[in-house]
Swiss-Prot record:
It is found in: Membrane. This is Matrix-remodeling-associated protein 7. It comes from Homo sapiens. Residues 32-148 are annotated as: Disordered. Residues 63-103 have a biased composition (Low complexity). Residues 110-126 have a biased composition (Basic and acidic residues). Residues 38-47 have a biased composition (Pro residues). Keywords: Membrane, Phosphoprotein, Transmembrane, Transmembrane helix. PANTHER family: MATRIX-REMODELING-ASSOCIATED PROTEIN 7, TRANSMEMBRANE ANCHOR PROTEIN 1. InterPro entries: Mxra7. The gene is MXRA7. GO terms for cellular component: collagen-containing extracellular matrix; endoplasmic reticulum; membrane.
């Protein structure tokens, strides 16, 4: 009999928690829907934000919106201290999301512009890198042994890097052959043709 009584006593608290959760989700959903139309005006603003002048005004604008939400929240869980604590962290998140959403949208727009610029640079890069490759100067890429495919490494590497790549490939090939010999029951017998095929794959 005590268990049903405890459940009945906890039922209002559970209902309040559920109501708070639903309200928080609706606020987040509304905040996610509202920045989409507002994303067009902030796009011209990022160059102005680079100066730093408008940046403080934007985070301050949603804060007054937090004060109307503040009195509503404490009124609901006033009698429940435990539920008030989760509502407290949830409360700043609701108003914080509208402030964070435009900022995140602006950051994403800036990142997208940077990626587009890099793509444009990448498209222009190969045409300008052609003469540099012939001279052997100015062309650079991040070298990581064993990661290049086909004959890429022959065209792009210095002599030292080419030797390192071939050394790594030989180590990989030796590991493959050892694995195949150690696991004959899994892979079967290795013929000379198999060895030649592997050597051809590694261009050796």
């Amino acid at each position: 009999m005590e268990a049903p009584a405890e459940l009945l006593a906890a039922l209002p608290a559970l209902a309040t928690a559920l109501a708070l959760l639903l309200a928080w989700l609706l606020v987040r959903r509304g905040a996610a829907a509202s920045p989409e139309p507002a994303r067009a005006p902030p796009e011209p603003a990022p160059p102005a934000e680079a100066t730093g002048a408008p940046a403080p005004s934007r985070p301050c604008a949603p804060e007054p919106a937090a004060s109307p939400a503040g009195p509503e929240e404490p009124g609901e869980p006033a009698g429940l201290g435990e539920l008030g604590e989760p509502a407290g962290p949830g409360e700043p998140e609701g108003p914080g999301d509208p402030a964070a959403a435009p900022a995140e949208a602006e950051e994403q727009a800036v990142e997208a512009r940077q990626e587009e610029e890099q793509d444009l640079d990448g498209e222009k890069g190969p045409s300008s890198e052609g003469p540099e490759e012939e001279d052997g100067e100015g062309f650079s890429f991040k070298y990581s042994p064993g990661k290049l495919r086909g004959n890429q490494y022959k065209k792009m590497m210095t002599k030292e890097e080419l030797e390192e790549e071939q050394r790594v490939q030989k180590e990989q090939l030796a590991a493959i052959f050892k694995l195949m010999k150690d696991n004959k029951e899994t892979f079967g017998e290795m013929s000379d043709g198999d060895v030649q095929e592997q050597l051809r794959l590694y261009d050796m």
